Regions:
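Non-catalytic N-terminal regions of enzymes
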Residues: 15, 27, 37-39
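Short hydrophobic beta-strand that contains or immediately precedes a catalytic carboxylate
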Residues: 31-32
Length: 245
Protein backbone atom coordinates (compact mmCIF):
# COMPACT_ATOMS: atom_id res chain seq x y z
CA UNK A 1 0.00 0.00 0.00
CA UNK A 2 2.80 2.44 0.91
CA UNK A 3 5.31 1.31 -1.70
CA UNK A 4 4.60 1.13 -5.40
CA UNK A 5 4.53 -2.45 -6.65
CA UNK A 6 7.20 -1.72 -9.26
CA UNK A 7 9.51 -0.06 -6.73
CA UNK A 8 12.58 -1.98 -5.65
CA UNK A 9 13.96 -1.48 -2.17
CA UNK A 10 16.82 -2.34 0.15
CA UNK A 11 16.23 -3.49 3.71
CA UNK A 12 17.94 -1.56 6.50
CA UNK A 13 16.93 -2.65 9.96
CA UNK A 14 13.12 -2.68 9.98
CA UNK A 15 12.92 -0.11 7.18
CA UNK A 16 12.80 -0.37 3.40
CA UNK A 17 14.89 2.17 1.50
CA UNK A 18 13.43 3.17 -1.88
CA UNK A 19 13.99 5.79 -4.53
CA UNK A 20 11.51 8.60 -4.00
CA UNK A 21 8.98 8.40 -6.88
CA UNK A 22 8.66 12.21 -6.94
CA UNK A 23 12.21 13.41 -6.27
CA UNK A 24 13.00 17.03 -5.55
CA UNK A 25 16.67 16.37 -4.75
CA UNK A 26 19.34 14.81 -6.97
CA UNK A 27 19.55 11.87 -4.59
CA UNK A 28 16.19 11.54 -2.88
CA UNK A 29 15.13 8.44 -0.97
CA UNK A 30 12.06 7.35 0.97
CA UNK A 31 12.65 5.14 4.01
CA UNK A 32 9.52 3.19 4.92
CA UNK A 33 8.77 1.32 8.14
CA UNK A 34 8.01 -2.32 7.28
CA UNK A 35 5.05 -2.50 9.66
CA UNK A 36 2.04 -0.24 9.38
CA UNK A 37 2.45 2.23 12.26
CA UNK A 38 1.50 5.92 12.55
CA UNK A 39 3.84 8.72 11.53
CA UNK A 40 5.47 9.98 14.73
CA UNK A 41 8.96 10.92 15.84
CA UNK A 42 8.27 9.78 19.41
CA UNK A 43 10.60 6.86 20.20
CA UNK A 44 11.92 7.08 16.61
CA UNK A 45 14.77 9.57 16.94
CA UNK A 46 17.18 6.73 17.70
CA UNK A 47 16.08 5.16 14.40
CA UNK A 48 16.80 8.46 12.68
CA UNK A 49 20.37 8.40 14.01
CA UNK A 50 20.77 4.74 13.01
CA UNK A 51 19.84 5.73 9.47
CA UNK A 52 22.12 8.78 9.56
CA UNK A 53 25.07 6.62 10.61
CA UNK A 54 24.43 3.82 8.14
CA UNK A 55 23.58 6.19 5.28
CA UNK A 56 26.28 8.72 6.06
CA UNK A 57 26.23 10.25 2.58
CA UNK A 58 22.69 11.42 3.30
CA UNK A 59 20.76 13.85 5.45
CA UNK A 60 17.80 12.14 7.15
CA UNK A 61 14.51 14.04 7.01
CA UNK A 62 11.31 13.78 9.02
CA UNK A 63 7.95 15.44 8.40
CA UNK A 64 5.26 15.41 11.06
CA UNK A 65 1.86 14.01 9.98
CA UNK A 66 0.48 17.57 9.82
CA UNK A 67 3.70 19.12 8.54
CA UNK A 68 4.00 17.82 5.00
CA UNK A 69 4.31 14.05 5.44
CA UNK A 70 3.48 12.36 2.12
CA UNK A 71 1.91 9.39 3.95
CA UNK A 72 0.75 10.84 7.28
CA UNK A 73 -0.71 7.53 8.46
CA UNK A 74 2.41 5.39 7.87
CA UNK A 75 5.84 5.81 9.46
CA UNK A 76 8.57 6.93 7.08
CA UNK A 77 11.60 9.15 6.75
CA UNK A 78 13.20 10.68 3.69
CA UNK A 79 16.84 11.20 2.81
CA UNK A 80 18.68 13.72 0.63
CA UNK A 81 22.30 13.57 -0.45
CA UNK A 82 24.62 15.81 1.57
CA UNK A 83 25.57 17.64 -1.61
CA UNK A 84 22.24 19.49 -1.28
CA UNK A 85 23.72 21.73 1.45
CA UNK A 86 20.41 21.98 3.27
CA UNK A 87 21.76 21.02 6.70
CA UNK A 88 22.09 24.71 7.57
CA UNK A 89 20.03 26.38 4.85
CA UNK A 90 20.35 30.01 5.87
CA UNK A 91 23.78 29.99 7.48
CA UNK A 92 22.03 29.94 10.86
CA UNK A 93 24.17 30.40 13.93
CA UNK A 94 22.72 28.84 17.05
CA UNK A 95 24.46 31.01 19.62
CA UNK A 96 22.01 31.12 22.52
CA UNK A 97 22.64 28.01 24.58
CA UNK A 98 19.44 26.76 26.18
CA UNK A 99 20.80 23.76 28.00
CA UNK A 100 24.05 21.88 27.94
CA UNK A 101 25.45 18.74 29.48
CA UNK A 102 28.89 17.22 29.51
CA UNK A 103 28.66 16.06 25.91
CA UNK A 104 25.74 17.77 24.22
CA UNK A 105 24.17 21.16 23.77
CA UNK A 106 21.00 22.54 22.30
CA UNK A 107 20.35 26.10 21.39
CA UNK A 108 17.65 28.16 19.77
CA UNK A 109 17.66 30.58 16.90
CA UNK A 110 16.13 34.00 17.42
CA UNK A 111 14.89 36.35 14.70
CA UNK A 112 15.59 33.94 11.87
CA UNK A 113 13.38 32.95 8.95
CA UNK A 114 12.17 29.95 10.93
CA UNK A 115 11.72 29.05 14.58
CA UNK A 116 14.37 26.41 15.11
CA UNK A 117 16.25 24.48 17.76
CA UNK A 118 19.67 23.00 17.05
CA UNK A 119 21.21 20.05 18.89
CA UNK A 120 24.75 18.78 18.51
CA UNK A 121 26.87 16.20 20.27
CA UNK A 122 29.89 14.00 19.59
CA UNK A 123 28.06 11.40 21.67
CA UNK A 124 25.12 9.44 20.24
CA UNK A 125 23.50 8.75 23.60
CA UNK A 126 23.87 12.41 24.56
CA UNK A 127 21.95 13.72 21.56
CA UNK A 128 19.22 11.07 22.00
CA UNK A 129 18.67 12.05 25.63
CA UNK A 130 18.66 15.73 24.72
CA UNK A 131 16.12 15.22 21.91
CA UNK A 132 13.83 13.15 24.13
CA UNK A 133 14.02 15.77 26.87
CA UNK A 134 13.15 18.49 24.37
CA UNK A 135 10.38 16.43 22.79
CA UNK A 136 8.61 16.10 26.14
CA UNK A 137 8.71 19.89 26.55
CA UNK A 138 7.62 20.55 22.96
CA UNK A 139 4.60 18.22 23.28
CA UNK A 140 3.14 20.48 25.97
CA UNK A 141 2.89 23.33 23.44
CA UNK A 142 0.71 21.17 21.20
CA UNK A 143 -1.55 19.90 23.99
CA UNK A 144 -0.04 16.42 24.07
CA UNK A 145 -0.72 15.55 20.44
CA UNK A 146 1.97 14.82 17.85
CA UNK A 147 3.97 18.07 17.65
CA UNK A 148 3.99 20.16 14.50
CA UNK A 149 7.67 19.72 13.70
CA UNK A 150 10.03 19.00 10.85
CA UNK A 151 13.42 17.48 11.67
CA UNK A 152 16.70 17.09 9.82
CA UNK A 153 19.51 14.96 11.28
CA UNK A 154 22.94 13.98 10.03
CA UNK A 155 26.24 12.46 11.05
CA UNK A 156 29.71 12.88 9.70
CA UNK A 157 29.83 16.45 8.51
CA UNK A 158 33.07 17.60 10.04
CA UNK A 159 33.05 20.36 12.60
CA UNK A 160 35.82 22.19 14.39
CA UNK A 161 36.59 21.21 17.95
CA UNK A 162 36.59 24.46 19.94
CA UNK A 163 39.29 23.31 22.34
CA UNK A 164 41.87 21.61 20.17
CA UNK A 165 41.11 22.78 16.67
CA UNK A 166 40.90 19.18 15.47
CA UNK A 167 38.14 18.07 13.13
CA UNK A 168 35.70 15.71 14.79
CA UNK A 169 32.68 13.71 13.79
CA UNK A 170 29.49 14.97 15.35
CA UNK A 171 25.78 14.21 15.54
CA UNK A 172 23.60 17.13 14.52
CA UNK A 173 19.89 17.86 14.41
CA UNK A 174 17.69 20.85 13.65
CA UNK A 175 14.06 20.88 14.80
CA UNK A 176 11.74 23.30 13.00
CA UNK A 177 8.82 24.28 15.25
CA UNK A 178 5.55 24.96 13.45
CA UNK A 179 2.34 26.77 14.30
CA UNK A 180 0.23 25.36 11.47
CA UNK A 181 0.21 22.91 8.58
CA UNK A 182 -0.38 25.25 5.64
CA UNK A 183 -0.36 29.00 4.97
CA UNK A 184 -3.55 30.79 3.96
CA UNK A 185 -2.32 31.19 0.38
CA UNK A 186 -2.61 27.40 -0.06
CA UNK A 187 -6.41 27.68 0.17
CA UNK A 188 -6.81 31.06 -1.56
CA UNK A 189 -8.30 31.33 -5.03
CA UNK A 190 -7.15 33.35 -8.02
CA UNK A 191 -4.11 35.60 -7.86
CA UNK A 192 -3.74 35.14 -4.12
CA UNK A 193 -3.56 31.37 -4.45
CA UNK A 194 -0.14 29.75 -4.04
CA UNK A 195 -0.04 25.97 -3.78
CA UNK A 196 2.66 25.59 -1.14
CA UNK A 197 2.33 23.17 1.78
CA UNK A 198 5.63 23.45 3.66
CA UNK A 199 7.46 20.26 4.59
CA UNK A 200 11.10 19.77 5.56
CA UNK A 201 12.34 20.73 2.07
CA UNK A 202 10.61 24.11 2.24
CA UNK A 203 11.74 24.70 5.82
CA UNK A 204 15.28 24.12 4.54
CA UNK A 205 14.87 26.65 1.73
CA UNK A 206 13.82 24.43 -1.20
CA UNK A 207 10.42 25.29 -2.70
CA UNK A 208 9.20 22.84 -5.37
CA UNK A 209 6.53 24.55 -7.49
CA UNK A 210 3.65 22.33 -8.58
CA UNK A 211 1.75 24.78 -10.78
CA UNK A 212 3.34 26.84 -13.51
CA UNK A 213 1.10 29.81 -12.72
CA UNK A 214 2.68 30.03 -9.26
CA UNK A 215 6.20 30.67 -10.56
CA UNK A 216 5.74 34.43 -10.85
CA UNK A 217 4.13 34.62 -7.40
CA UNK A 218 7.18 33.36 -5.52
CA UNK A 219 9.19 36.26 -4.12
CA UNK A 220 11.57 36.62 -1.19
CA UNK A 221 8.91 38.67 0.61
CA UNK A 222 6.24 36.00 0.07
CA UNK A 223 8.51 33.20 1.26
CA UNK A 224 9.38 35.18 4.38
CA UNK A 225 5.66 35.70 5.04
CA UNK A 226 5.01 31.97 4.67
CA UNK A 227 7.80 31.11 7.11
CA UNK A 228 6.43 33.56 9.64
CA UNK A 229 2.89 32.24 9.24
CA UNK A 230 3.68 28.54 9.65
CA UNK A 231 6.42 28.85 12.30
CA UNK A 232 5.97 28.91 16.05
CA UNK A 233 5.96 32.46 17.38
CA UNK A 234 8.95 33.92 19.19
CA UNK A 235 6.76 34.28 22.29
CA UNK A 236 6.02 30.55 22.28
CA UNK A 237 9.70 29.80 21.71
CA UNK A 238 10.59 31.94 24.72
CA UNK A 239 8.07 30.03 26.83
CA UNK A 240 9.75 26.81 25.73
CA UNK A 241 13.26 28.10 26.43
CA UNK A 242 12.16 29.26 29.87
CA UNK A 243 11.06 25.70 30.62
CA UNK A 244 14.39 24.25 29.56
CA UNK A 245 16.75 26.83 31.06
Amino acid sequence: VYKRQEQTSLSLGHYEVCLNPYPIFRRHLTIIEEEHTPQTIKNRFEDMLFLAENMNEFLILYNGPECGASAPDHMHFQAAGKEEKIANPFGMTFISDMLSSEDSVHSHLENGFTTSIGISSPNRRGIIEMFEYLYDKIVSIYHDKEPLINVIAWYGLETVNRTGGDEIKQWNCIIFLRSKHRPECYYAQGKKGLLISPAIAEMCGVFPIVREEDLDKITAKKITQIYKEVSLSQEQLKALTDQTS
